[in-house]
């Protein structure tokens, strides 16, 4: 008992001496240790929590877009891209209100092989338009990872001049695995941009693929960016994408590459003469340019405007837009039916059951699909 008391007292004295800094005693003459300073709190205690901004109404969105408010336009595009049901409902109301103010722009789809310099080309051509008094919206579609579904959204960083231009609006969006590398909501975003007063819309796609029909079905002019020495000009491969193109530009025609670019230009022209005449009755032109040195950029824009004037004159421009509207009506119906089917509670349960039966080879894919569809339509 006595030992315990002594131990407690010893510990107390030790702690007391530590608190009073034993170094200040006479034994340590000449050495002084001051008491420490209490550190301020890591978080400001007087800081008030930032209040969350109230959600915008449909009227707020429409008014902001028509008044060319870029912040509200960006928020409206985010609303359109959202997958939440309440956001989708509000987005559709905003789009319907904006439709009467849309349809007055020139829509240009830009595609090409990876590394062809699409973003740099858009930066150069876009600055040419902005300097000429146009208002330009660029919808840059970035590829999404098939594994993580993520996207870098780095296209805007490569458009150094255009990204800070006053009359330019750049919106990078993930492709999210949609058809042709074009985000599903790009069509609706175009409507919002047109209502905001943009007279020219660029849609940059992920790259050349078999299903680039999506971008072709929402633009007035389809531009293919190519490089010299890729072999396409010799073999005539990627015939489908070349048949869709309303114009071809050989980029990076600078330095030691000028001669190769001119050779590729001649070979592409020869290849195009073997194709049937397009529905527009306007034979696609092939030009060379250097986006870095900004050579040939004005000729590219003249090619686009000449095409628009020609097709408006023969009625193809209006006919094509009507055909596109019909195409997107069916696409929207398909998407809504697909979403309705897969979000049905009964179908979700049955899908798991039939997946198990398929893996056990107890049922065929076609029988399983028919039973699921029958159940879905009977419940309706």
What is each stretch, according to the model?
Residues 4-9, 14-100, 348, 352-353, ...:
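Non-catalytic terminal/linker segments enriched in charged/polar, low-complexity residues
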Residues 57-111, 116, 122-211, 216-225, ...:
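Nucleotide-state-sensitive switch-loop elements of NTP-binding domains
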Residues 73-75, 288, 299-377:
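Long, well-ordered amphipathic alpha-helical subdomains in the mid-to-C-terminal portions
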Residues 152, 189, 214, 218, ...:
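Alpha-helical scaffold elements adjacent to nucleotide-binding pockets in ATP/GTP-utilizing enzyme cores
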Residues 200, 221, 246-247, 270, ...:
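Well-ordered beta-strand positions
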Residues 215, 230-259:
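Flexible active-site lid/hinge loop adjacent to a nucleotide/diphosphate
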Residues 253-309:
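Canonical P-loop GTPase G-domain recognition
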């Amino acid at each position: 008992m006595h030992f315990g008391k002594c131990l407690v007292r010893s510990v107390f004295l030790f702690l007391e001496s530590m608190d009073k800094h034993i170094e200040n005693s006479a034994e340590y003459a000449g050495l002084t240790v001051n008491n420490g300073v209490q550190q301020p709190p890591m978080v400001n205690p007087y800081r008030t929590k930032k209040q969350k901004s109230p959600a915008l109404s449909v009227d707020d969105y429409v008014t902001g877009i028509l008044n060319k408010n870029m912040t509200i336009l960006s928020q409206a595009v985010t609303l359109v891209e959202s997958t939440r049901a309440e956001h989708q409902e509000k987005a559709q109301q905003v789009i319907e209100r904006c439709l009467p103010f849309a349809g007055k722009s020139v829509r240009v789809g830009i595609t090409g092989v990876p590394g062809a310099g699409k973003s740099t080309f858009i930066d150069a051509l876009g600055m040419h338009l902005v300097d000429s008094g146009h208002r330009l919206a660029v919808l840059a579609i970035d590829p999404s990872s098939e594994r993580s579904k993520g996207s870098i959204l780095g296209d805007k960083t490569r458009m150094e001049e255009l990204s800070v231009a006053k009359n330019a609006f750049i919106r990078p969006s993930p492709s999210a695995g949609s058809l042709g590398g074009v985000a599903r909501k790009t069509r609706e975003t175009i409507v919002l941009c047109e209502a905001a007063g943009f007279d020219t819309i660029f849609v940059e796609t992920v790259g050349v693929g078999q299903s680039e029909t999506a971008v072709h079905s929402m633009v007035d002019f389809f531009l293919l960016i190519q490089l010299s020495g890729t072999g396409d000009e010799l073999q005539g491969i990627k015939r489908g994408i070349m048949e869709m193109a309303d114009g071809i530009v050989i980029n990076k025609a600078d330095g030691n590459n000028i001669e190769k670019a001119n050779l590729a230009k001649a070979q592409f022209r020869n290849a195009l003469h073997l194709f049937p005449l397009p529905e527009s009755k306007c034979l696609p032109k092939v030009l060379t340019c250097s986006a870095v040195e900004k050579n040939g950029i004005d000729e590219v824009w003249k090619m686009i405007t000449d095409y628009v004037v020609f097709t408006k004159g023969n009625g193809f421009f209006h006919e094509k837009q009507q055909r596109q509207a019909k195409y997107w009506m069916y696409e929207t119906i398909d998407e809504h039916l697909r979403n309705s089917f897969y979000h049905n509670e009964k179908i979700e349960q049955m899908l798991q059951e039939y997946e198990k039966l398929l893996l056990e080879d107890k049922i065929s894919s076609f029988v399983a699909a028919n039973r699921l569809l029958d159940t879905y339509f009977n419940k309706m």
